[in-house]
Amino acid sequence: MGQFLSSLFLGQPYQNMGFVVGALMIAASGIIPLLILPRERSSKDDGDGKSGAEAAKEALENLLPPKLKGAHDFYKACGGRLLMMASYAMISQYTLYIFENYVGLTVQEAAKAMGTLSAVTFVVSLIGLAVSGPLSDKIKARKTPIAIACVLFIIGTLCPVMFRSVNGVLLYAAFAGLGYGVYIAVDGALNVDVIPEEAQHNRTGGKYIGFGNLANTCGQVLAPATTAMLVAVTGSYYTAFIVSALCALAGVSLILWIKSVK
């Protein structure tokens, strides 16, 4: 949806207003939930009997990564998540520049193509989300849908390599967008399933979920930097497509290595 809205401003005299609209939407995403959600009860009077120093020490310990012992599958899932998200973001965050510098479109032509690409991505992602989650629950397996998502990622990233055209990039959006929807629908459940039982008993599962989200964010942060470096070194997006496919392959390999989840 964000890509579609930004394409409406691209190449227009009011192009800079896109930044203003984006900033307002970011602000609204924080303010609206704050106004709607019930007020959270204060914990200052819980009376757990801990001194200030003990509470501070516990808070600092909670910021440390989970222990590796008993959490091997969890770290495999985190590594797989980082690589899968990096694979998708390496290309999806650069589609505008791919249209302009790889395919050779003008700014106006790229803006029109971005609108089409965003619509394609939106539709196929919803289809992937709607099908993958219920299917995963029905077959009681997490790794199978993720393997399918990986195949879709790889097919998508190779389409612009084989077809250096608008249609090639749109094929990327169709395959990779569908793969993204399939993956996102199952990824969260997988990362909950691999949380060690000890953490569930100690009620520290939130720490594991937070660390898993960090892996997700790191993948999206490292991806554009990696693409920029590859393009700067090679002078083309060709290598970025190949590396993106390899990241997806490495990510799904880690996930398939998980032993505690089917």
Give residue ranges: language-model regions.
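A membrane-interface helix-boundary motif in multi-pass transporters
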Residues: 8-24, 227-248
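Helix-to-loop junctions at the C-terminal end of transmembrane segments
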Residues: 10, 128-141
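Multi-pass alpha-helical transporter architecture, strongest
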Residues: 28-37, 222, 242-262
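Juxtamembrane intracellular "pre-TM" segments in multi-pass secondary transporters
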Residues: 40-79
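Short amphipathic helix-loop junctions that connect adjacent transmembrane helices
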Residues: 93-112
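C-terminal ends and interior cores of transmembrane alpha-helices
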Residues: 151-164
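Intracellular juxtamembrane helix-capping segments at the cytosolic ends
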Residues: 182-200
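A late C-terminal transmembrane helix in Major Facilitator Superfamily
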Residues: 201-233
